[in-house]
Amino acid sequence: MSSYALPSMQPTPTSSIPLRQMSQPTTSAPSNSASSTPYSPQQVPLTHNSYPLSTPSSFQHGQTRLPPINCLAEPFNRPQPWHSNSAAPASSSPTSATLSTAAHPVHTNAAQVAGSSSSYVYSVPPTNSTTSQASAKHSAVPHRSSQFQSTTLTPSTTDSSSTDVSSSDSVSTSASSSNASNTVSVTSPASSSATPLPNQPSQQQFLVSKNDAFTTFVHSVHNTPMQQSMYVPQQQTSHSSGASYQNESANPPVQSPMQYSYSQGQPFSYPQHKNQSFSASPIDPSMSYVYRAPESFSSINANVPYGRNEYLRRVTSLVPNQPEYTGPYTRNPELRTSHKLAERKRRKEIKELFDDLKDALPLDKSTKSSKWGLLTRAIQYIEQLKSEQVALEAYVKSLEENMQSNKEVTKGT
């Protein structure tokens, strides 16, 4: 199982962070020798820079206590190669935090979730002989700092019988020893000095993230690495306005081949890239002709819809191209005068012809009609005359037949 930790943790130098501020003095845990218990926490007085996680009333005897917000929770079944007394632990996490208090119900549930013989044991100074024998295997890890000593959260690979004994007693011992120490020591694996790192979180960040301790502990234990990607660290989300603008401008969104930018004057169906077709797009080639854009457009027909523009393009392609003039066409005054005289003569002749047509039609001469009205009346009159001519020809033919019959009768008599 791969190791993972809380998503928003940053490496911090060795510092003393009190867990709570006691209203009344409590009895300290029985002290042991330095050789048997190297985890005896150092007494650090409470100062104005303390970060109380809860009220003093919630830390009475018989009540459960939650782990601090800035602790690491590694997987239960992770194998550790440094269980000897001489080798120092090689921390794979970027940050190593120490824990002084732990809740017994939370530890019991966490051991059930692990589902194997190796569980997550809190190694604390033992108080009786039974606890010291059970947890003697976990007291060989050397100190991480020469100035501050604290109880370290270390995994255990003992059998199931010794795990149950050490876990139940060590949690109760941790509760009693935390009443005397009231501190949590955070140690950086890179350096044990007190020099602050450049990315060290401020005190306000600890105050903001210290309230939801139980939720953070449960998420760090039960979340998988895939689920932890949803929890974005605070430093990635709290950008300033200028930094976010630079980040967005440096990484522009990638547009797909199907996305086109449209200009303000063009209709929606026209892409800005007129010569680009959808043949190179990852769609079905058999359907590409339906969405293919026209190859070329003229500036005059740019705002015409696709169907009408296609029709105009086909029609105008049949018209031969007119040769362009080398210069503007100019006429001399004589040509202008002759053109005006010819235009006046033509209009006069047309007016006279329409007047003759109006006289030929059986219309009232006093009514004023337009040229369109005169032509319409003339067409109707011509059709009427044709029908009358056909009727007259039929009548004349019938009269001729009657005359022939009358002649034959007169000859026979």
Swiss-Prot record:
Residues 1-22, 43-63, 127-136 have a biased composition (Polar residues). Coiled coil: none annotated. Keywords: Differentiation, DNA-binding, Nucleus. GO terms for biological process: cell differentiation; induction of conjugation upon carbon starvation; positive regulation of transcription by RNA polymerase II. One of its GO terms (cellular component) is nucleus. CDD domains: bHLHzip_spESC1_like. Gene3D superfamilies: Helix-loop-helix DNA-binding domain. This is Protein esc1.
